[in-house]
Amino acid sequence: MIRSVVRGIGSALPKRVMKNTDFEGIVETSDEWIVQRTGIRERHIAGKGETTVSLGAAAARAAIENAGLQPSDIDLVLLATSTPNNTFPASAVAIQRELGITRGFAFDLQAVCSGFIYAITTADLYIRGGMARRVLVIGAETFSRILDWTDRTTCVLFGDGAGAIVLEAAEGHGLTSDRGILAANLRSDGNHKEKLYVDGGPSTTQTVGHLRMEGREVFKHAVGMITDVIEASFEATGLTAEDIDWFVPHQANKRIIDASAKKLHIAEEKVVITVDRHGNTSAASVPLALATAVADGRIKKGDLVLLEAMGGGFTWGAVLVRW
């Protein structure tokens, strides 16, 4: 059987780092208040000339180089983002051009913070269906451009950045010891769409709008939804939490991460946390955390890695991958 194996990984962050203390002159807040409630200490903010496309292209180049490939080897460019450069054409097409790729196809996918999980799952389907051999999967965001900088409950939470992986078709044996994606589960429930949304859009207000969130409501649903979809992935493979080498969750809030790991009985030392350095980078969150753990030597070939995310909609999902 065909498996989708991770061949390369890369990331990119804006130059500017904004610390919690930098917010004290903007809104009524403090470093202590932010850290206590979120675990965030700093985040990167896109500056002039830094966009979703430029960050995504930089992460993509790094992933292709890490894979030992050339841009011309890529069949599909799949970008998960909620902050595209333009309403259309797709920012994935712009990244395709930046990389000099003139073959295959490219498109954007939008599932907010769950975007990268949705994108990996979509890429896996294209690979296993024979429509692509190598897929460049990117999560890139510039959420700082849709924040209300007078709302202290949201503006302190988010950062900008990008992460990317190259998935490649490889022959597997249908075993959980195979390298590659072993299971993926996606969910959504539009009944919760008013709990985390942007109050604008081309079809309604003809503006971009700003991010709005009912933080307590999101927190209330997050842990249960996340653990349910993870347990479904375990059931599909016969694996358990004890088999997990690394848990790479969406980096939204350390409280949610800790509560999810505890409910799943995943040891603290197996949890990859970058929310303290990156904040919530939406669709870029999981690949940025993955890239960090690969770069520092934690995640190694053969490790069983659990990925999960939850975002506006609500959307949520989980992926089990053998590195």
From Swiss-Prot:
GO biological process: fatty acid biosynthetic process
Location of the protein in the cell: Cytoplasm
Pathway named in the protein's UniProt entry: Lipid metabolism; fatty acid biosynthesis
Pfam families linked to this entry: ACP_syn_III (PF08545), ACP_syn_III_C (PF08541)
Protein name according to UniProt: Beta-ketoacyl-[acyl-carrier-protein] synthase III
Keyword list, A-Z: Acyltransferase, Cytoplasm, Fatty acid biosynthesis, Fatty acid metabolism, Lipid biosynthesis, Lipid metabolism, Multifunctional enzyme, Transferase
Catalytic residues (positions): C113, H250, N280
Role: Catalyzes the condensation reaction of fatty acid synthesis by the addition to an acyl acceptor of two carbons from malonyl-ACP. Catalyzes the first condensation reaction which initiates fatty acid synthesis and may therefore play a role in governing the total rate of fatty acid production. Possesses both acetoacetyl-ACP synthase and acetyl transacylase activities. Its substrate specificity determines the biosynthesis of branched-chain and/or straight-chain of fatty acids.
UniProt subunit comment: Homodimer.
Superkingdom of origin organism: Bacteria
Domain notes: The last Arg residue of the ACP-binding site is essential for the weak association between ACP/AcpP and FabH.
The EC number(s) this enzyme carries: 2.3.1.180
Gene: fabH
MF (Gene Ontology): 3-oxoacyl-[acyl-carrier-protein] synthase activity; beta-ketoacyl-acyl-carrier-protein synthase III activity
Catalytic activity, as annotated: malonyl-[ACP] + acetyl-CoA + H(+) = 3-oxobutanoyl-[ACP] + CO2 + CoA
Enzyme category, top tier: transferase
Region (ACP-binding): 251-255
